[in-house]
A protein has these predicted regions:
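C-terminal auxiliary extensions adjacent to catalytic cores
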Residues: 191-238
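A conserved FAD-binding loop/helix module that cradles the flavin
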Residues: 135-177, 181-183, 192
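Amphipathic alpha-helical segments in well-structured domains
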Residues: 11-15, 48, 149-150
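FAD-site-proximal beta/loop scaffold in flavoenzymes
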Residues: 84-150, 162
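A Rossmann-like FAD-binding core segment of flavoenzymes
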Residues: 19-115
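Cofactor-binding loop segments of dinucleotide-utilizing enzymes, especially the Rossmann-like FAD-
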Residues: 1, 36-38, 134
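Glycine-rich dinucleotide-binding loop and its adjacent helix/turn
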Residues: 1-25
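FAD-binding beta-loop-beta segment adjacent to the flavin cofactor pocket
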Residues: 112-130, 183-204
Length: 238
């Protein structure tokens, strides 16, 4: 779907891994990525280079392809200028904050997202209600990633403790994001960024020169990706 949506590189990673499987086991099959966006929205150069060099005959990317309707019976996706029938459709619909947020009247931006005070992640319309992760209207250049949501939670928890104990809320929080994506079963890439609260603009802004993307896909990044995944799962779920 058109950005913003959850896990910006997710659809491209998924397509890459399906193409990797097809190349090994079903060489007559093909992946067609129909993207509502004008271009790849995350790790563009790394993904497009992988597709060109690894899956030139296996994966086709079509930008500006906004889905309007799905016929599940015929496995057909209807787009503005064409209908596409496939053996398997993997549809990712437009996204918004969940029904609990909608029912509570917390969605205030574009009928999709919840606006918050970024120092506390408190709702702009419901005092003492704190919202984080994919549900919020993100700050500039802030991805809707699980790693970022984990950082949101830490800032929010720290703020809630301060508010409950009568202490001052941290007025200069810093968030970090790291995301790895596999482009084959043994090759991966990453993107990283740092976001600092700007008191004047009352939002988080990306720190220039902090973070970046992989120089190239490689097996070392694939090993790092697995370690990164285990660490974020442990930090979030245990």
């Amino acid at each position: 779907p058109k950005a913003p949506y959850r896990c910006p590189p997710g659809p491209y990673e998924r397509a890459s891994l399906v193409a990797s499987y097809f190349k090994r086991s079903k060489p007559k099959s093909k992946v067609i990525v129909l993207d509502a966006n004008a271009e790849v929205v995350s790790k563009k150069g790394l993904f497009t280079k992988a597709w060109e060099e690894l899956y030139k005959d296996t994966l086709e990317y079509r930008p500006n392809s906004e889905l309007t309707e799905v016929n599940a019976a015929t496995r057909t996706g209807k787009f503005q200028f064409e209908d596409v029938q496939a053996g398997v459709l993997n549809v990712i619909p437009p996204q918004r904050a969940g029904s609990i947020a909608a029912n509570a009247g917390l969605i205030t931006a574009n009928k999709r997202w919840c606006e918050v005070d970024f120092l506390t992640f408190e709702s702009r319309v419901a005092p003492n209600v704190h919202i984080l992760g994919d549900a919020i209207l993100a700050a500039p250049a802030m991805p809707k990633s699980a790693f970022m949501a984990n950082n949101h939670a830490k800032v929010a928890a720290d703020a809630v403790i301060a508010l409950l104990t009568g202490k001052s809320v941290n007025d200069h929080p810093i968030l970090a994001n790291t995301c790895y994506s596999y482009v084959s079963d043994r090759l991966a890439i990453h993107v990283a960024s740092v976001h600092k609260f700007d008191a004047e603009k009352k939002t988080f802004l990306a720190v220039p020169g902090a973070g970046g993307v992989s120089a190239a896909r490689n097996e070392v990044e694939a090993d790092y990706a697995w370690g990164w995944a285990k660490n974020i799962w442990a930090d979030t779920l245990r």
